């Protein structure tokens, strides 16, 4: 019997004792109620309590009958006086009942429930001068109270009220049932669980905690023996596990105690699932796993174990001992061959006594396989063994060594000068390029033998002794930092630039390679000089463009300003006003072209940064339409916007996207004759937003379409032709691209493909890598 069972049995015994006392008290109360009814009948026949026999007042227990709000003393005058003294009240029935109600709100609620609804109650009332045991029952139209003072000397002894309170304090359901399984009394937890009005038999009629529990009660009553069972029951909407104990009681009935073991069962279930998952995991690994218990019997094995050794599952299911497994494997020649098998087996089984880490073994089996055996003590006792077939691994290792030899032979054919030195400094390998590079003969290298001798042969071409000392440290020093890969360049006495590399090899050797990179470095130097010259030229060009552009903007600003003043001036003719407007328009166009040149120069220099924000696409199109509407009206062209409702927002630089649309709209208006139509539209598809500017103009010739986005492509009307090139550059800054669809005579459509989300400075690579 486990400790849990002992605790459960002790608790069940205590509860059964309490239930037995409560049952005895219940019988006593029933007998007393019958006596009180008879006494009240005699009292009424005698004409009132004043004529009652004197012996009625001799009881220590006061019996009070309550009907219609009136309380009458039936018996126990001395008991009433003692109770009144304990409660600090007058020795009158009404005063005592009132004192009970005033002593505690809970007492008042219980008495009200008794007088109004006939609900029984049992409690101990504490007054200023003592304790009073109170028991209330309803019989017919009367409510009866039995009051008894509790002597201070007996205040710690168990009473019926205290036993009832003790049983009610138990959080698990407890009840007394008849032989048919029907509950006849229950504690507060049981009453709540079954939804009964009270703990008395009439209120419990038809109530059941669990049908399976009732069956256990019937079985215990029928056999007169204690019965236990585990039941899963829904309590207050939650599924709980209860350990049910049904104990037949002397005098009839069965006491039932329930212990809530939900957490224990949950832990048990979780542990079971954990073990199953652990076993399932081991069953899916390639290694053979076996677990032997403390008694050296096989407690677990995975599928790979049975397959590795060719053992029958039925035989393994009988849980053979470790020794029996070894004997069967030896009979089938599946263990390493040994002269003293008995000693080998004894040493193998003696490992159970060694609780520390154990070294791994390699078993060479007669069939040519090699097994790696790993042993470790199991946390629950016994031993865990893992068998791994490493035959293929050893075969691969041999193949790998052969491959290394082939690779070393391959190094001998390289153009670079290669030499391999062992950890002892001896020259192990060199190629012909090494002999040529240092102008030494094979015989001289063979005679040199070690690193120091080789250095003496190479010093005439490389005089830097500090270089050779450092290289020697790479070869002979076992410090991991010194054996780290290194590379660098040195210059020989004949002015060659030599690239050297040092690489440690797995066997402790060191590979040193030398390459003549003189021509490469000369070419790199020439390219660097040319690149610097080009960068300087680009800088000068950018500075020149910037200076010229800023120099032009000053007079243009003056021209535009005075043109606007002249347009608004009085006394100027209409023809003169038109001329002034033309001057202002030309100056504005020139200023815009200068801005385009500056923007393009800034983009070329990689200095343009985007100010990313949320932009409503519909607002972007409508604003572009508003800016170009006047020019469209002057040219007799219809400018329309078509935007789908679900396009929504886009992440980008609002100023630069507006500049892009302005250039596209300007180009479309320029290509569209009077009466034509230019349409701005947007749609969302395939994770991008597409902005279209289409026109019904004359279209773009096929031979021009391939170069339409190049810089300074000529236009029908003057200008540097940077508009479309700037459009392409700005869209690419947003991580997008621009496409053209055009057929000569049928108009053109420029489409800007923009990603839905954009990071500042993003740009699509030109080659799409």
From Swiss-Prot:
Post-translational modifications: Autophosphorylated.
InterPro entries: HATPase_C_sf (IPR036890), His_kinase_dom (IPR005467), HisK_dim/P_dom (IPR003661), HisK_dim/P_sf (IPR036097), PAS-like_dom_sf (IPR035965), Sensor_HK_Regulatory (IPR050736), Sig_transdc_His_kin-like_C (IPR004358)
Recorded GO CC terms: plasma membrane
Residue ranges crossing the lipid bilayer per the database entry: 6-26
Top-rank lineage group of the source organism: Bacteria
Pfam families per UniProt: HATPase_c, HisKA, PAS_7
Entry membrane topology: Single-pass membrane protein
Annotated SUPFAM superfamilies: ATPase domain of HSP90 chaperone/DNA topoisomerase II/histidine kinase, Homodimeric domain of signal transducing histidine kinase, PYP-like sensor domain (PAS domain)
Subcellular location: Cell membrane
Catalytic activities: ATP + protein L-histidine = ADP + protein N-phospho-L-histidine
Primary location group: membrane
E.C. no: 2.7.13.3
SMART domains for this protein: HATPase_c, HisKA
Domain Histidine kinase: 547-758
Role summary: Required for cell division and growth. It catalyzes the phosphorylation of CtrA and activates transcription in vitro of the cell cycle-regulated fliF promoter.
Protein name per the record: Sensor protein DivL
Organism (species): Caulobacter vibrioides (strain ATCC 19089 / CIP 103742 / CB 15) (Caulobacter crescentus)
Gene (name only): divL
């Amino acid at each position: 019997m486990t400790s849990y069972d002992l605790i459960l049995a002790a608790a069940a015994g205590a509860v059964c004792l309490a239930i037995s006392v409560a049952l005895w008290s219940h019988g006593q109360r029933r007998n007393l109620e019958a006596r009180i009814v008879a006494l009240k009948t005699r009292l009424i026949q005698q004409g009132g309590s004043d004529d009652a026999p004197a012996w009625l007042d001799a009881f220590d227990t006061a019996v009070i009958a309550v009907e219609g709000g009136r309380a009458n003393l039936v018996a126990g005058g001395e008991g009433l006086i003692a109770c009144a003294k304990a409660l600090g009240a007058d020795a009158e029935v009404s005063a005592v009942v009132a004192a009970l109600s005033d002593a505690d709100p809970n007492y008042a609620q219980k008495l009200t429930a008794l007088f109004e609804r006939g609900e029984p109650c049992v409690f101990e009332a504490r007054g200023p001068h003592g304790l009073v045991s109170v028991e209330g029952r309803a019989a017919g139209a009367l409510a009866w109270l039995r009051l008894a003072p509790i002597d201070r000397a007996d205040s710690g002894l168990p009473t019926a009220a205290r036993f009832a309170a003790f049983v009610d304090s138990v959080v698990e359901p407890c009840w007394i049932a008849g032989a048919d399984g029907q509950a006849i009394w229950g504690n507060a937890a049981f009453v709540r669980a079954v939804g009964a009005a009270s703990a008395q038999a009439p209120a419990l009629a038809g109530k059941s905690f669990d049908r399976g529990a009732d069956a256990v009660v019937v079985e215990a009553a029928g056999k007169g023996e204690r019965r236990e069972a585990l039941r899963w029951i829904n309590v207050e909407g939650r599924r709980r596990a209860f350990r049910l104990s049904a104990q037949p009681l002397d005098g009839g009935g069965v006491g039932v105690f329930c212990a809530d073991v939900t957490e224990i069962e949950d832990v048990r279930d979780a542990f079971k699932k954990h073990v199953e998952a652990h076993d399932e995991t081991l069953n899916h690994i390639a290694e053979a796993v076996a677990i032997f218990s403390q008694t050296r019997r096989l407690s677990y094995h995975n599928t790979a174990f049975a397959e590795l050794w060719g053992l029958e599952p039925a035989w393994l299911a009988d849980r053979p001992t470790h020794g029996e497994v070894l004997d069967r494997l030896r009979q089938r020649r599946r263990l390493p061959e040994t002269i003293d098998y008995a000693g080998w087996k004894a040493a193998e089984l003696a490992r159970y006594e060694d609780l520390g880490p154990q070294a791994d073994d390699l078993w060479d089996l007669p069939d040519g396989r090699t097994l790696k055996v790993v042993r470790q003590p199991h946390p629950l006792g016994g031993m865990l063994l893992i068998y791994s077939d490493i035959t293929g691994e050893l075969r691969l290792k041999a193949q790998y060594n052969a491959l290394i030899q082939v690779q070393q032979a391959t190094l001998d054919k390289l153009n670079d000068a290669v030499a391999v030195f062992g950890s002892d400094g001896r020259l192990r390998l060199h190629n012909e390029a090494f002999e040529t590079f240092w102008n030494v003969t094979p015989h001289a290298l063979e005679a040199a033998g070690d690193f120091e001798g080789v250095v003496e042969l190479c010093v005439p071409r490389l005089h830097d002794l500090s270089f050779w000392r450092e290289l020697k440290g790479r070869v002979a020093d076992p410090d991991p930092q010194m054996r780290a890969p290194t590379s660098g360049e040195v210059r020989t006495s004949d002015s060659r630039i030599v690239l050297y590399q040092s690489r440690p090899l797995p066997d402790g050797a060191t590979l040193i390679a030398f390459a003549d990179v003189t021509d490469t470095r000369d070419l790199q130097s020439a390219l660097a000089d040319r690149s610097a010259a080009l960068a300087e030229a680009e800088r000068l060009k950018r500075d020149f463009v910037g200076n010229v552009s800023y120099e032009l903007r000053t007079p243009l600003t003056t021209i535009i300003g005075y043109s606007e003043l002249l347009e608004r001036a009085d006394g100027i003719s209409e023809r003169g006003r038109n001329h002034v407007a033309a001057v202002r328009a030309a100056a504005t166009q020139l200023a815009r072209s200068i801005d385009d040149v500056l923007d393009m120069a800034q983009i070329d220099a990689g200095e343009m940064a985007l100010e990313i924000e949320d932009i409503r696409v519909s607002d972007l199109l409508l604003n572009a339409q508003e800016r170009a509407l006047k020019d469209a009206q002057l040219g007799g062209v219809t400018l329309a916007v078509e935007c789908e409702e679900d396009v929504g927002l886009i992440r980008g630089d609002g100023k630069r996207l507006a500049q892009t649309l302005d250039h596209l709209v300007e180009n479309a208006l320029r290509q569209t004759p009077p009466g034509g139509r230019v349409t701005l539209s947007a749609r969302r598809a395939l994770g991008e937003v597409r902005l279209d500017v289409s026109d019904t103009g004359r279209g773009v010739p096929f031979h021009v379409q391939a170069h339409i986005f190049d810089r300074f492509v000529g236009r029908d009307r003057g200008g540097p032709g940077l508009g479309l090139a700037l459009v392409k550059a700005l869209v690419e800054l947003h991580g997008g691209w621009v496409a053209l669809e055009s057929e000569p005579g049928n108009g053109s459509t420029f489409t800007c493909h923009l990603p839905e989300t954009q990071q500042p400075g993003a740009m699509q690579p030109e080659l799409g890598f």
